Amino acid sequence: MRCSISLVLGLLALEVALARNLQEHVFNSVQSMCSDDSFSEDTECINCQTNEECAQNDMCCPSSCGRSCKTPVNIEVQKAGRCPWNPIQMIAAGPCPKDNPCSIDSDCSGTMKCCKNGCIMSCMDPEPKSPTVISFQ
């Protein structure tokens, strides 16, 4: 019995620590990375050690001549949470507009996600993930 209580308390403490850690971080919906062609021979060798040494939005990336400033590649990162489920929003209330306000999460500000809303995509506040319930018997 003591072992079960200790296990439950340990899991609860871990869940609280992880939840706190997630709240402290702000995730960007677009992540910049060095491109795969960083090692190509035709790269200009402007040596650097950190991103701060590079002009504008360039990054200090590995290259054929050590490390040099390169234009990064932006990769879409999906924002936390999920789009809210509302069956009424899945049905268009009238004629559909031609343009969507968004097409990917990074088109939306803050923590909002790009979700289906009738016949268009629009920025909406996400639903938090449902907590996982663990039962011990």
Curated annotation (Swiss-Prot):
PTMs per UniProt: Contains 8 disulfide bonds.
GO molecular-function term, one example from the UniProt record: peptidase inhibitor activity
Disulfide bonds: C34-C61, C45-C65, C48-C60, C54-C69, C83-C115, C96-C119, C102-C114, C108-C123
GO CC aspect terms: extracellular space
UniProt-recorded name of the protein: Whey acidic protein
Organism: Rattus norvegicus
Key words, A-Z: Disulfide bond, Milk protein, Protease inhibitor, Repeat, Secreted, Signal
Tissue specificity of this protein: Milk-specific; major protein component of milk whey.
Gene name per UniProt: Wap
Single GO biological process annotation from the record: antibacterial humoral response
Domain spans labelled WAP: 27-73, 76-127
The protein's role, per its UniProt record: Could be a protease inhibitor.
InterPro entries (UniProt xref): Elafin-like_sf, WAP_dom, WAP_four-disulfide_core
Signal sequence residues: 1-19
Record's subcellular location: Secreted
